[in-house]
Amino acid sequence: MPAYRSRTTTHGRNMAGARGLWRATGMKDSDFGKPIIAVVNSFTQFVPGHVHLKDLGQLVAREIEAAGGVAKEFNTIAVDDGIAMGHDGMLYSLPSRELIADSVEYMVNAHCADAMVCISNCDKITPGMLMAAMRLNIPAVFVSGGPMEAGKVVLKGKTHAVDLIDAMVAAADSSMSDEDVQTMERSACPTCGSCSGMFTANSMNCLAEALGLALPGNGSVLATHADRKRLFVEAGHTIVDLARRYYEGDDESVLPRKVASFEAFENAMTLDIAMGGSTNTVLHLLAAAREAELDFSMKDIDRLSRKVPCLSKIAPSVSDVHMEDVHRAGGIMAILGELDRAGLIHNSCPTVHSETLGAALARWDIRQSNSEAVRTFYRAAPGGVPTQVAFSQDRRYDELDLDRQKGVIRDAEHAFSKDGGLAVLYGNIALDGCIVKTAGVDASILTFSGPAKVFESQDDAVSAILGNKIVAGDVIVIRYEGPRGGPGMQEMLYPTSYLKSKGLGKACALITDGRFSGGTSGLSIGHVSPEAAEGGLIGLVRNGDRISIDIPNRGITLDVAADELSRRAEEEEAKGDKAWQPKDRKRKVSAALQAYAMLTTSAANGAVRDVNRRLGKGK
């Protein structure tokens, strides 16, 4: 039977000094035999998805102590990708994931915590904490701050549900008046919470449910709704129970690596494909699986993408459908229920709240559940009042969305498409693969071929788009923006948003070794691996080269003869120390970012660090 980790610092004569310090934090004699639970918070006033978390850590802490544990709270950093977007601040977003994972490891191991509750929400925070949970493998429960309410705006006499992306597109649309743009800006982000569409933050919080590490409703119940308080309360009680089951009952089934098994990662990716989640989730699931020492790879994602249908389309893939609408249709448990009925998930996987996922679905899938409380829970509605206060309203819809033929969530028979919402493409320009969010691609451009227009920074591409130098049929190539080449693998949300504003969203393709925001739609292909900075073929593309994209057959090809590509590669290698580097660009790369670039790996491996690279053993 494993001993409580915390006893390293709370038991024995030689730990008198440590106990003295624990006492200075408020612990009493009776506390030294209890599990010490880390409350891993991420409150910050910089991020709307985290601005309301300040008091929620202490809410969880009180429930932990009521259940018989000792709670100790600390915070990680949190970067707002939307505020960091479109300038050099975005270089820091993906690297912050590793810092978050490390900071959790440092705090939990330095103080010998027995278990943890992870309070996350936005883009890199949930993945960073998930990586830490897999790395540490101590009992863990995830609870997020919840989605923002969608904005409501009246334009030309019609009410629209809007979000951050709509504001960005409007700002670049010269046909919109300054007044309408300001109305959109003031309406797009009305409350605290993670941005209201199926962007990266909400995608990851939904996947935490599928992995079995979060409570039902984690991904979909609004940050402002009173129902969300129950998740925090239950998280506090659940983690104490899990800690006791492991340390006192020798029950290893509660550990993150047992809950988030290979099959659970398949479930999460299956959900991701079915709901058309952010392409960033691919990076994060690969990274978390690596921390769990699981052999879960791009090949597994490709395999799943070929058999899983698209059962839901949410902004940005369609307008006017946001997380509040997904919740009304039964949330993530409803999508998992449809996947289960189609035989596409492993329902025997354990979860932190139920013996198996199948047992959870029996209670929480609204097509199966007989519980009136569950049905009431999924009728939670937006309050419609701008606020930064959690749990501030308790409005409910009159009825649920149970339409599985034309509703927000479809059954497999009535799927939006038989192919899912994400796909892996392979070809000479992406030997290790690249990712496209097919849920956001118009059917008319699932196959596409056009001349390349090459840019060696996002900034140059944006200037060309806004300067009307891009025309219908072009394939925009943005390179040297990968994990090493950026460094930091910037998101390309502004280029795709500006293409929309120019009326080119369905007329051009964009290919990059960088990545895309969860708010991106259109023929946007990212994570091209190997990246240009690692000698990838994307580094050899020249203006005018034809690039062909075939999503149905999962192909992407640079249509240039092999001998010509060999000649270009030799020419590049002849540059010596300047080989596989971008032309001069005005970009300050700090020592912190240089350190990240030295250790990071390909997007095909989750862009995680590999210390063997520094030791000369890695690729």
Swiss-Prot record:
**PROSITE patterns, per database record:** ILVD_EDD_1 (PS00886), ILVD_EDD_2 (PS00887)
Report the enzyme's class at the first EC level.
lyase
Q: Name one GO biological process term.
A: isoleucine biosynthetic process
Cofactor binding description: Binds 1 [2Fe-2S] cluster per subunit. This cluster acts as a Lewis acid cofactor.
Task: Name the UniProt key words of this record, in alphabetical order.
Answer: 2Fe-2S, Amino-acid biosynthesis, Branched-chain amino acid biosynthesis, Iron, Iron-sulfur, Lyase, Magnesium, Metal-binding
Cofactor entry: [2Fe-2S] cluster; Mg(2+)
Residues the record marks as active site: S517
Catalysed reactions, semicolon-separated: (2R)-2,3-dihydroxy-3-methylbutanoate = 3-methyl-2-oxobutanoate + H2O; (2R,3R)-2,3-dihydroxy-3-methylpentanoate = (S)-3-methyl-2-oxopentanoate + H2O
Q: Which SUPFAM superfamilies match?
A: IlvD/EDD N-terminal domain-like, LeuD/IlvD-like
The catalytic activity of this protein is classed by the Enzyme Commission as 4.2.1.9
Q: Which parts of the sequence bind [2Fe-2S] cluster?
A: C122, C195
Listed pathway(s): Amino-acid biosynthesis; L-isoleucine biosynthesis; L-isoleucine from 2-oxobutanoate: step 3/4; Amino-acid biosynthesis; L-valine biosynthesis; L-valine from pyruvate: step 3/4
* Alphabetized InterPro entries for the sequence: Dihydro-acid_dehy_C, DihydroxyA_deHydtase, DiOHA_6PGluconate_deHydtase_CS, ILV_EDD_C, ILV_EDD_N, IlvD/EDD_N
Source superkingdom? Bacteria
| UniProt-recorded Gene Ontology molecular function terms | 2 iron, 2 sulfur cluster binding; dihydroxy-acid dehydratase activity; magnesium ion binding
Any one GO cellular component localisation term in the record: cytosol
Question: Which residues does the record list as N6-carboxylysine (modified residue)?
Answer: K124
Name the positions where Mg(2+) binds: D81, D123, K124, E491
- UniProt cross-references to Pfam families, sorted A to Z: ILV_EDD_C, ILVD_EDD_N
Q: How does it assemble?
A: Homodimer.
Q: Which family does it belong to?
A: Belongs to the IlvD/Edd family.
Q: What does this protein do?
A: Functions in the biosynthesis of branched-chain amino acids. Catalyzes the dehydration of (2R,3R)-2,3-dihydroxy-3-methylpentanoate (2,3-dihydroxy-3-methylvalerate) into 2-oxo-3-methylpentanoate (2-oxo-3-methylvalerate) and of (2R)-2,3-dihydroxy-3-methylbutanoate (2,3-dihydroxyisovalerate) into 2-oxo-3-methylbutanoate (2-oxoisovalerate), the penultimate precursor to L-isoleucine and L-valine, respectively.
What is this protein identified as? Dihydroxy-acid dehydratase
Q: What organism is listed for this UniProt entry?
A: Rhodopseudomonas palustris (strain HaA2)
Gene that this polypeptide is encoded by:
ilvD
